[in-house]
């Protein structure tokens, strides 16, 4: 029956957790009521959501609700806007936790990593499954720190809608812009939640205006605050002309009253609400033709008579079309406004069937899923999060991975509840699942029921099976994967002893599967292992995880900036490779030209002269492209990747019987020759910087940035603070958080994001090369 009891010590509280082994539904149901009285929970870490709550739910309703009742949503925002606190309140009010988790206390459900609870930030996106008023909500809490942008990208890829959380005193901040652009890329409908309305300096109007100006979005005001900062008491429902007031004597925010606004007691508030509602109706009518016809036809004389349900349906359509964004407000920390936010999620955000995924027509109901996250569990092995787009998943099912062209058997199927999971018999389209047994699958892989299913889908998509067609077929069936950003920092990492090197390699291999933004490579000169990451905090977290999870006390070298290289002029080179292996002669001769690319490009552009035979290219194209990309991995100056270059192959002679490996070796050597002959340029990462500082500290901050080669673009006013926007080289901003704290007595904050790579000045480049090699470089 139950395999084991585990006792968790969370914030010095004794918390029991029941782990369910595989059992049929009837056995689970028979034990639910008995367990209900036996679990002395202060927080619900039960494997089955709702298992110990007063309202014990049917396991059938928990597993597979109708698709129209599913909402796959993410919570996204700038760091410290209140994402995790909002998530914890959602969990509590939906009945899946029995006490309120707090970021400062380190006992939140979705921040389950030790580093997250210590630092009070979210590092990995945690999936949580809950029910709200008959709806299934799969909710993902994402990081707000720029070093963990990939986590945001991973979760947005599989969502149908999102809640953007804003600090009402700050409005749109730097990382908000980043995640908003990511959501735009994936065409995700959003609603906005103006959090921290109780905070000093909170301004509803300012926050709404910043959404309009900075995000270029059209806000639809669905709520008005009753008071601001210390006077914040509740919200007004503009659509229904009702006020929601929370009981000040209630500790958890569950006790609130919804009352119609009356002319007698709420004259000014009612007047303001009617104006806001009329404005909302006009906005929505401009954006939705169906609603415009209704309003102009039946209610042109009096907008007050427009039914709330008609207005809600129109707002839903406008949100789905991403023509505008509904705006709500509240204070998650003070337990106000979260229940209406959940209502808005189910009312205005789309179900999976309302999202247009054109590729689904090719599968005709067969299984199609995307792996968007991989974790490692010491007992279970790799845990793969899947978004199911069509078909049904069951345990012991053999599935085909299109990306890796392999078939694996899924041993177990789980429903995710932060770091707790319940085993289930099946899961259908629209849901997010956690699978055990997929050892080859990595982030971004497309999973189907079988290889024959993939080929059948390709035929339905009208793809031929001519030469090279198979590759195009596979590409046409792949779901858009997760775009992995290039790392900007690197450092060496050493195990405590040579004997521990295999253990370190094993740990890094697992961490890379979990986090594709972490790159690990071997330095060819020193033989050292090199970590490449997205920022100082990213590298620090990886180092800490190796110690905590794998018991390895590793040593990090100095943190260094990941530069790029390029060329400034056009150069030709030739090379011949002539080898005899056994009784076989391998002969390749090539001539190529490298030149600066007309447009910036991370990967070298490859072209072929007309004189290069098409038959020769058919057999060798893959080897040629592999050689060029390999040669560009290490530039001649710093060994950094080469970008913004183009290559033209002018001639290629291959002796009959020559292996493609020799073709690759010859082209790669020829490419390296050309790069060495060209005039070379180092490119450094340029970061966009946003510093929020009080007026009295503005001057020292600006003076310090000037010394760091900073280029100030604009200084904005945000309430009583000043916001400095500009660009600064990454090399100049390392360790900046400590400096900024010192300059401003800890009152300022800053955010960084990679903007582009820019050419270094000759003086700075020479100094860098001297520092790296200890020798003067003549370019």
Curated annotation (Swiss-Prot):
Cited SMART domains: EFG_C, EFG_IV
Top-level enzyme category: hydrolase
One Pfam family per UniProt: EFG_III
Annotated positions binding GTP: 77-84, 141-145, 195-198
tr-type G domain location: 68-353
Catalytic reaction annotation: GTP + H2O = GDP + phosphate + H(+)
Note: This protein may be expected to contain an N-terminal transit peptide but none has been predicted.
Subcellular location: Mitochondrion
Gene Ontology MF term list: GTP binding; GTPase activity
Function recorded in the entry: Mitochondrial GTPase that mediates the disassembly of ribosomes from messenger RNA at the termination of mitochondrial protein biosynthesis. Acts in collaboration with MRRF. GTP hydrolysis follows the ribosome disassembly and probably occurs on the ribosome large subunit. Not involved in the GTP-dependent ribosomal translocation step during translation elongation.
Gene Ontology cellular component terms for the protein in this record: mitochondrion
Protein's name in the database: Ribosome-releasing factor 2, mitochondrial
Keywords, sorted A to Z: GTP-binding, Hydrolase, Mitochondrion, Nucleotide-binding, Protein biosynthesis
Positions of transmembrane segments: none
